[in-house]
Swiss-Prot record:
SUPFAM superfamilies: Leech antihemostatic proteins. Glycans are attached at T45. Belongs to the protease inhibitor I14 (hirudin) family. The keyword Zinc does not apply. This is Hirudin-2B.
Amino acid sequence: ITYTDCTESGQNLCLCEGSNVCGKGNKCILGSNGEENQCVTGEGTPKPQSHNDGDFEEIPEEYLQ
């Protein structure tokens, strides 16, 4: 499974979509209401790219540099 990185902002909130990155070694955990996402160290919540459980889209290599 590939995890989607995110951008840290404000009170450690982040966007878990697009090409945003949370920072080296950090991943995004989705908030229960879909708003209060957090950047944390290590593996976070995988971001589904479709309505099928377990169906994830890999992060393009250029975003992992």
